Amino acid sequence: MTTRTETAAYESHHTAPRDARDTDRTMPLATVRTLAASAHVGDLVFIRVPAKAPRDAAGATGSTGAWANRFGIVVDTSGDEPVIAESAFAWTKLMPLSRFVARTDGGRIALARRVAAPTTDAQRQIHSTAERRIDALLGNRFNLRTRRGFCADYVSDVLGADRDATPAALLRSDTLSLEFDGIVFDPGRPS
């Protein structure tokens, strides 16, 4: 048996820019369980839900990195799987990660974490704000007034982003570090 040592000539690959996220590159794979194990309270989970209404299509096409049209915030990791808070018409819905992931088009998920603030005092203040927002949401699950606008308030107060920021704009922001961007599947779920 002979060993093949020659290689085809190719151009070197350069690192893709931060906003080059909707490419045809090979995506990493993960299960819902491994994604759940790496999720922390305060993380943002991005998905693409097929557009059903004109408001669903907003920000879905056009600029690079606009593949995501929905995001949720991890608000609890104490149970079997993380609980995701997602903005809905009139209030915030709470659902398990597996149900949130099951809605995605093509299985693509991005998990992003807030970048640490530059000073210890700023880190404490942001962490305290995030905890207050999440505690108010979870402590008043049946108070619709408290549940209204949670995601927009969280994005504004904790991430310092505009209340009306699109998921694509949040993904490209410098306030988040991308922990996972790939395809997530649930082996227990029929295809």
Q: Where are the model-predicted features located?
A:
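N-terminal accessory segments that precede or flank the first globular/catalytic domain
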Residues: 2-79
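Activation targets extended, charge/polar-rich intrinsically disordered C-terminal tails
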Residues: 5-12, 142-191
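Generic N-terminal initiation segments characterized by hydrophobic and/or small/turn-forming residues
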Residues: 7, 24-26, 32, 94, ...
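Short linear motifs in intrinsically disordered/low-complexity regions
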Residues: 15, 20-23, 44, 77, ...
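Short secondary-structure transition/capping segments
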Residues: 38, 124-128, 133, 185-190
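Glycine-rich catalytic cores of cysteine/serine-nucleophile enzymes that process amide/ester linkages
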Residues: 47-113, 140-149
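Active-site nucleophile-His-acid catalytic modules used for acyl/amide transfer and hydrolysis
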Residues: 54-57, 107-168
